[in-house]
């Protein structure tokens, strides 16, 4: 990214603020936006009053924590071949709450892949990539969505 592009970074408003303790709600919002336009279809594009502040130095881009949804109630995801090793992860899930597990993974500086369950049968794949400074939380849907509800 050149120095000219640096000043053009803009932070936009989100409906559910990215927070480690409400990751289940954010996942639900993203799935609803993709499947149904939900209740704020105009909130996806940036408008004049959606801009909160100009971004800081955009050259400081760090590695991220990646969270992927691969199964959820009422929505079938197909063509998803991800299936990581499970041993240590499920031991951590039984030992700690899900929020504690997320914050624990967020603070560490090693690569870790984990599958754990959230409320309403939603399963999350968490992969922690080594970071330099702070990490961002990205949420994406793994596979294609099929709508077979009548």
From Swiss-Prot:
Subcellular location field: Membrane
Endpoints of the signal sequence: none
GO cellular component terms, semicolon-separated: membrane
Keywords: Membrane, Transmembrane, Transmembrane helix
Ranges annotated as spanning the membrane: 15-35, 51-71, 73-93, 110-130
Membrane topology value: Multi-pass membrane protein
Keyword Transmembrane: yes
Further comment found in the protein's record: Partially overlaps IMA3.
The protein's name in its UniProt record: Putative uncharacterized membrane protein YIL171W-A
């Amino acid at each position: 990214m050149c120095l000219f592009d640096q000043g053009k970074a803009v932070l936009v408003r989100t409906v559910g603020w990215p927070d480690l303790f409400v990751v289940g709600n954010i996942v639900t919002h993203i799935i609803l936006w993709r499947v149904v336009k939900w209740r704020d279809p105009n909130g996806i594009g940036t408008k004049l009053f959606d801009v909160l502040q100009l971004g800081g130095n955009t050259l400081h881009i760090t590695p991220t924590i990646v969270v992927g949804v691969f199964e959820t109630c009422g929505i079938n995801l197909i063509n998803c071949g991800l299936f990581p090793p499970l041993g240590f992860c499920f031991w951590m899930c039984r030992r700690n709450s899900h929020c504690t597990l997320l914050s624990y993974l967020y603070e560490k500086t090693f690569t870790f892949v984990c599958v754990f369950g959230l409320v309403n049968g939603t399963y999350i794949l968490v992969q922690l990539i080594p970071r330099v400074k702070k990490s961002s939380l990205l949420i994406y849907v793994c596979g294609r969505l099929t709508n077979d509800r009548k």
